[in-house]
């Protein structure tokens, strides 16, 4: 039986989130055993924020949730790919469809931002 290896990175594994239809990589985040278990049980993506040191469900603030369609692990069982149906226009907190909108071009990083929502409106605090 395959067991996910959370030991290599201090209890965390990278999770590559991919659109289940197009194959586009939407985001990469980290999971621990608890968030992987929640994701597999709920069918929604859950992550561990290293910055905020807390658990969070994708879309809990924005409403842009992700419905899990398929979960795969790599040959070392230390990374997962989660294929999702993206509910709402964007996966990235910047309002972009994908977090990967900055491209290396002509020796520099070039932003190809096309926000689908205004993060200042969606993530109002207070």
From Swiss-Prot:
Species the sequence originates in: Geotalea daltonii (strain DSM 22248 / JCM 15807 / FRC-32) (Geobacter daltonii)
Record localization: Cytoplasm
Protein name: Phosphoribosyl-AMP cyclohydrolase
Binding sites annotated in the UniProt record for Mg(2+): 74, 76, 78
Pathway: Amino-acid biosynthesis; L-histidine biosynthesis; L-histidine from 5-phospho-alpha-D-ribose 1-diphosphate: step 3/9
UniProt cofactor note: Binds 1 Mg(2+) ion per subunit. Binds 1 zinc ion per subunit.
Reactions accelerated catalytically: 1-(5-phospho-beta-D-ribosyl)-5'-AMP + H2O = 1-(5-phospho-beta-D-ribosyl)-5-[(5-phospho-beta-D-ribosylamino)methylideneamino]imidazole-4-carboxamide
Oligomer and partners: Homodimer.
């Amino acid at each position: 039986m395959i067991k996910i290896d959370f030991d290599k990175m201090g209890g965390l594994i990278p999770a590559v989130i991919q659109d289940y239809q197009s194959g586009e990589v939407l985001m990469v985040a980290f999971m621990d055993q608890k968030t992987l278990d929640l994701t597999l049980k709920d069918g929604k993506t859950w992550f561990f924020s290293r910055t905020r040191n807390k658990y969070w469900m994708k879309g809990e603030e924005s409403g842009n949730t992700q419905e899990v369609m398929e979960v795969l692990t790599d040959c070392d069982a230390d990374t997962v790919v989660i294929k999702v149906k993206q509910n709402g226009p964007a996966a990235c907190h910047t309002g972009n469809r994908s977090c990967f909108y900055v491209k290396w071009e002509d020796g520099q990083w070039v932003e190809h931002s096309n926000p689908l929502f205004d993060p200042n409106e969606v993530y109002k605090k207070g």
